Amino acid sequence: MKNSASIMENMPDSGSNIEEAKKTEVFEPRIIGFLCNWCSYAGADKAGAAQKHYSPNVSVIKVMCSGRIDPQFIMDAFQNGADGVMILACHPGDCHYKEGNYRAVQRHRLLLRLLKQFGIEEERCRFDYVSAGEGDRFVSVINETVEAVKKLGPLKIIKN
């Protein structure tokens, strides 16, 4: 019968196993997607109905209008662990509420300046247009965003 000292000598160092696992671990970003109810969310439905495959890294939040997305929602998403955020709006001129998507564009521009102040790359916050009939475009935007955020790596944000 072996004594406990000889058993321990033959066991691999668990600390090195953890470090090896971290090196081989593939980064899968967490992305929050804010989708307009009238266009982008319907585009997502179309993609789903057509059984289009896209990255599961995006958690969708349906909003009635992209113009109602408060910049604080985006900051909260990053503060709570999101590596990226998407805002998907109606195409210009197609907003159900007339001007909501224009308001969203203006807020996004201001938000990018704010993110820069916090050291967050602007590529982590994508704004794009997807209409109700653009299921394929929805899939492309999702997959492009996930790949862009993967290249950036995990968001390193300092919490208070």
Q: Model segments located where?
A:
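Iron-sulfur-associated redox domains of electron-transfer enzymes in respiratory
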Residues: 1-160
